[in-house]
Structure formats: structure tokens, C-alpha cells
Amino acid sequence: METRIVLGSSAEASEHAPDLVGRISLVVTSPPYHNAINYQEHAINPEVNYRSRYSQDYANEYMALLNSIWNESYVMLMNGGYLAINVGSVLDNGFHYPLGEDIITELYKSGKWEYVKTIFWNKVTAGVKRAGSVIQHPYPAYWHPNIMTEHIILVRKEGPIREPNSDVPKEWMQPVWDLAPVPPKTVNHPAPYPEDLPHRLIRMFTQEEEWVMDPFNGAGATTKAATDLGRSSIGFDIEKKYIALAKSRQKSPTSVRPKQLKVVPVNAKDFVAGPSKGKTRHGAGLGVRKK
């Protein structure tokens, strides 16, 4: 087992790790929030969350960056490997922009990926509270529900269909995952996601000793989860501060909830992961269909 935490852009992953081209089983990541946080400024002054405004020019630039990352992820993945993207919607000046749907559209337009499933991460205890405007102005046009969910978009590279692991709890096969977010100020990063999230995906779609990649490794939840599960991993970030943070977390105790560590077997013979090329048929659960 090996862990690499790399200072550099994942858009050049094949240059940083040419020996891993075509060897990654799973790419799992959460891109920087589109307009919520300036990560470079936060690395200098962590006491302040720097926010920027939504603009079409910036949106185009942001989507172009993501597309370059997904293209490089495709290069790094083995045939039949998976890409899992955790992303939230963009909220700016009262308007809601469907970033997850935009990413799915871009992935589809590339002609490279097989769409498997979108899982909805229900944050349970946290989110953007917007319902107050409805209480103040009880009219249909003022309906603004609280934002309590994010997307986990799952696509795969064409190739042999791999059976999921037999130690996957049945609740993970549902399209909604109830996971509490990381409590505020417990990790020195503006937007860490809970280790439970990559932990589930890594257990579902990889075997021990296989490779996992996170193009936006940030606080290191993905590389930490991979280590805990006996997988090799490579994570990228462009900020030295977050590289040091991710490395330091490798030795920390797991923060995965005890319930997630319990093994509740499912019959792997009843399922195969992902659709066949050109088809969108799926059976019960997460992007799976019966043989």
C-alpha cells in the first residue's frame, strides 16, 4: 500500500504520476465550491471565508477547469473505473444555479463517460437556511426551501464490468445518503467533507491494494479513507498548507462513524456495477443492474 500527496495540479496528473496512468480504480473528489470560498485567500487567513460573486465569465472558466480535470481523470482510470464527484448547487444573490446538472451535461457531451447514478447526500443537520423568507412572505413566488443536499455524481469509463464488494451495507445502495457534515472548526480547511463519504465509495468500488485518486484532495479525507481501507491513493492540491494538513491526517484516528464500519453483506452475485455501453438500465440500488 502506498500514499502519495502531491503539490501540483491534477490537470497534469499523468505527468506527476506516469506510472499510474490506466491504473486508478476510482477517482473520488469534491471540487472547490464554485463561488463560495476563495481557497487561496483562506490558506493565508483561515479566520475569514472569502466569497466571490457568480458571473457567466467565471462560470465558464470554472467549468473549463473541471472539464480538464475530468479528462485527465479519464486518462488515469483503468478501463471500467469509476469517477465520483461530490458537488453542491450554487446560490448567489437569491438565485439557485444547478451546478450538478451542468457537470452531468458536460460529462455527457464529452462522449467519454457512462452515466451510472446520482446519489443525493442529505446533510441531516446542516445546510443553507432559506425557509425564513417563506415565513416572512407566505406567497408561492417566495418558496425557497432550505438547501440540505448535495450531489454525488457517479460515472464510469468504458470497460469490463466489475462486481461490487460483498461487504457493502444495504443502506449504501439507496439513492439518498444521510451523512452529517464535518463539525465547524474541527478541520483547518474551509470545506472538508466527511470521511464517511469517500469511505463508502472506496469500499464499494475498489479492492484492497488498488489505487484511488482525488484531484482536489484538500484536507485529505479521501487519502485518509483509502489508507484506513488498505487502498493505495494519490491526492493533489495546489496549496502547500493543505498538502501538510492532508499528510498530518494520515496518522490520525478514523472519523468514520462506527455504524459505517459494521459489515452487513449483500449478495454480490445479484448485482454488477454500472451499465453496459449505450444503455441506461439499472436495477435496484446504486447504479447497478441484475445479470
Predicted segments, located by residue:
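Alpha-helix boundary/capping detector
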Residues: L99, S133-V134, K224, S252, ...
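Core catalytic lobe of class I
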Residues: M1-L245, K279-K291
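Short Lys/Arg-rich cationic patches that frequently serve as NLS/NoLS or arginine-rich RNA/DNA-binding motifs
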Residues: S255, K259-V263, G274-K291
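Short, flexible loop/turn segments with low-complexity composition
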Residues: P164-P169, R257-N267
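Conserved SAM/SAH-binding loop
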Residues: L7-A13, V263-F271
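Short, conserved SAM-binding/catalytic segment
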Residues: M1, K247-L261
